[in-house]
Amino acid sequence: MEPSPLELPVDAVRRIAAELNCDPTDERVALRLDEEDKLSHFRNCFYIPKMRDLPSIDLSLVSEDDDAIYFLGNSLGLQPKMVRTYLEEELDKWAKMGAYGHDVGKRPWIVGDESIVSLMKDIVGAHEKEIALMNALTINLHLLLLSFFKPTPKRHKILLEAKAFPSDHYAIESQIQLHGLDVEKSMRMVKPREGEETLRMEDILEVIEEEGDSIAVILFSGLHFYTGQLFNIPAITKAGHAKGCFVGFDLAHAVGNVELRLHDWGVDFACWCSYKYLNSGAGGLAGAFVHEKHAHTVKPALVGWFGHDLSTRFNMDNKLQLIPGANGFRISNPPILLVCSLHASLEVFQQATMTALRRKSILLTGYLEYMLKHYHSKDNTENKGPIVNIITPSRAEERGCQLTLTFSIPKKSVFKELEKRGVVCDKREPDGIRVAPVPLYNSFHDVYKFIRLLTSILDSSERS
């Protein structure tokens, strides 16, 4: 029976349990969800780490040939199997023809980045000419802020969320200092209310309305790295524009995780990395977006050879013919080996589509949430053991695939025991463990096994 597009995860779980005449927490529910999953075959496009290869594993607790339970795609995505093939293609080309590789093959090196932009446009919801694939995320953020942050005595602030990812915080702080401004006065952070972990949308909009005339740039995460909160990008953009602000986003934890419509939402600029949900490998090629409305008005503050139009680039006359829009921000030759790894992943996304992946993700993370609450919620009167609290918003439209968990016992001991059993997740200060079932390669049975292991760990801690 095909689930309704509007069916809530909890309803889907209960529906299947009723069909199977079993409890919603039964393993058969997870197996049926996997049977109904039309995206399950994409798992075969990735290398899944084996238990025996994990550094913290206790082989007395697991079968060494089993797949790990990999819930860390929010930090580093798994390797697409085609990466090695694409890398070898370019290494062979280099070995066999040297510099001729710049101009021939399916990825001519001189336009290597441009050869895969078409695969990125639907993931971020942008036109090809609005996207540049280059550098690393924070470098791109600096380049964009140099062009969009033009403070005046009246409009000099950058607005961001409190406890933004440190690299964003440092970048904004240093940009403010670069202009000789006082960080205390020009760096405006929106904080959660007392006793709350996440930001309320009304509080963000209130700050924009009340202080917008003094804000030059609003720069938020699309999705917060710690709490997993997905911000309302179109609403923030609309509110910022109403007050005359430029609005940009760091999409590190949003790209490849949730559906984006950067062009339609009118976002001024954005940047992202590609090694998390986009599976391009550590330090993979990052991306930048500049809305086409700024193509001829907002120009890069720093330029290089690859911002010059290719048709006249080799005239060598030192007369800059700047490419309008995002591609004008490119400075240097694209790193073709990084292009290869990103290419391998983006092809999988093109086949799966973000719409289908997001639909599965809502159900997958919803199933995880249901199971956590069933066994370990403080609201479950039958739960006499340690409590698991989910600080990530419960509404699907306010989160991606990640849930951030806190515990009534020290997280360090929980994390260590999970590692021993082949669960790959991470801990983040002050007290969270981040768990991210990724729809491209994680299964509902992964979630079921994780819950079984976590329950066993918590039960053991209670007995000891």
UniProtKB/Swiss-Prot annotation:
Question: Could you mention a single GO BP entry for this protein?
Answer: quinolinate biosynthetic process
A single Gene Ontology MF term assigned here is: kynureninase activity
Question: What does the entry list as the binding residues for pyridoxal 5'-phosphate?
Answer: L137, T138, F165, P166, S167, D168, S221, D250, H253, Y275, W305, N333
One Pfam family it belongs to? KYNU_C
* Cofactor dependency: pyridoxal 5'-phosphate
- From the Swiss-Prot or TrEMBL record, state where the protein is found: Cytoplasm, Cytosol
According to the UniProt entry, which residues carry N6-(pyridoxal phosphate)lysine?
A: K276
Instruction: List the record's Gene Ontology CC terms alphabetically.
Output: cytosol; mitochondrion; nucleoplasm
Q: Which residues carry this modification: N-acetylmethionine?
A: M1
Knockout-associated phenotype: No visible phenotype. Mice were born at the expected Mendelian ratio and are normal. They however show very high levels of L-3-hydroxykynurenine compared to wild-type mice.
Report the EC number(s), separated by commas if there are several.
3.7.1.3
Q: What InterPro entries does the entry give?
A: Kynureninase (IPR010111), PyrdxlP-dep_Trfase (IPR015424), PyrdxlP-dep_Trfase_major (IPR015421), PyrdxlP-dep_Trfase_small (IPR015422)
| Gene3D superfamilies given in the database record | Aspartate Aminotransferase, domain 1 (3.90.1150.10), Type I PLP-dependent aspartate aminotransferase-like (Major domain) (3.40.640.10)
Catalysed conversion reaction: L-kynurenine + H2O = anthranilate + L-alanine + H(+); 3-hydroxy-L-kynurenine + H2O = 3-hydroxyanthranilate + L-alanine + H(+)
- Key words of the record: Acetylation, Cytoplasm, Hydrolase, Pyridine nucleotide biosynthesis, Pyridoxal phosphate
**Where are the coiled-coil regions?**
none
Q: State which pathway it belongs to.
A: Amino-acid degradation; L-kynurenine degradation; L-alanine and anthranilate from L-kynurenine: step 1/1; Cofactor biosynthesis; NAD(+) biosynthesis; quinolinate from L-kynurenine: step 2/3
Source domain of life is Eukaryota
Quaternary state and partners of this protein? Homodimer.
**What is the role of the protein in this entry?**
Catalyzes the cleavage of L-kynurenine (L-Kyn) and L-3-hydroxykynurenine (L-3OHKyn) into anthranilic acid (AA) and 3-hydroxyanthranilic acid (3-OHAA), respectively. Has a preference for the L-3-hydroxy form. Also has cysteine-conjugate-beta-lyase activity.
- Record-stated family: Belongs to the kynureninase family.
The molecule here is called Kynureninase
Organism from which the protein derives: Mus musculus (Mouse)
